[in-house]
Amino acid sequence: MSKTATLADTVCHTSTENLDLIRGGSLLAPALATMQEMPFGRDTTLRRLLPQIPDTYDFVFFDCSPSLESLFNINVLVAVQYVLIPIKVDKNSIEGYNVMLETIQSVREIANPDIRALGIFMTAVETGASLDREMIANFPQMLPELAFHSYIRKNIDVKKAP
């Protein structure tokens, strides 16, 4: 995104009806580099830019890496109302959701009083694995107020994709 381009200029229309994307990588890299150089206000950049996106969207989703140290991820947390938390069926992800909930609480207290955890869902689930089947059965009872009953299966074809 150049200094003259707006966030709306980066919206890519897809062949799927009612689905547009803002691609990361090369399009967002210059904006992220610019944010890194800002002396102040860099954690609120996205919140200031979001009004540039047309009101034609009911939802705007940001797909973030698991790192809570990323400037982009911090910007997202400061800008959004709701957070969907994906977890894999592994020790790090299961322990990490508590850290994420604590982070959301901190962001709510300091920078974004509107942020809430909307829910937690399992991803990369291998339904043939006994641990994954056990998690599918017990997950809703573990987090009754946040757990989604649906999950995303692990798909090897996604890993093979270019």
Give the ranges of each region predicted by the language model.
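P-loop NTP-binding core
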Residues: 1-162
